[in-house]
């Protein structure tokens, strides 16, 4: 991602699991782009608002139960014309498999998909990989 960015732009990544820091930070620091990437350890719901960022692109790959909350938070800071990418929106087919209707993560993804589908502020599509 950083390779395709314009000079002066940056990536801010939020990681709630501090155990991931020891694994991830050396990769970031040894990449060709360390000044462009900020890794913030902690809860995005507490840390993002005081940062007052304008977001061009957000990538959601977090607790599936909270995708709706991540979306609503990010929308407050997303610039006009910005993008939100969300991982696992098909959740390995679980979102259409009735056997997973009571699974909390599947419910979270379904709620997210329904919210985005109904949100007239955004253009949307699912790109299955």
Residue spans for each PLM region:
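S-adenosylmethionine/decaboxylated-SAM
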Residues: 1-129
């Amino acid at each position: 991602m950083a390779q395709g960015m314009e000079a002066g732009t940056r990536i801010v990544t939020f990681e709630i699991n501090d155990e991931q820091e020891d694994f991830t930070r050396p990769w970031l620091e040894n990449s060709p782009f360390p000044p462009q990437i900020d890794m913030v350890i902690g809860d995005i719901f507490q840390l993002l608002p005081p940062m007052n960022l304008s977001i061009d692109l957000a990538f959601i790959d977090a607790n599936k139960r909270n995708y709706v909350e991540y979306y609503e938070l990010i929308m407050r800071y997303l610039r006009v014309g910005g993008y939100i990418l969300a991982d696992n929106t098909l959740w390995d087919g679980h979102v259409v498999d009735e056997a997973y209707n009571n699974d909390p993560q599947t419910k979270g993804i379904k709620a997210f998909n329904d919210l985005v589908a109904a949100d007239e502020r955004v253009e949307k599509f699912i790109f299955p990989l």
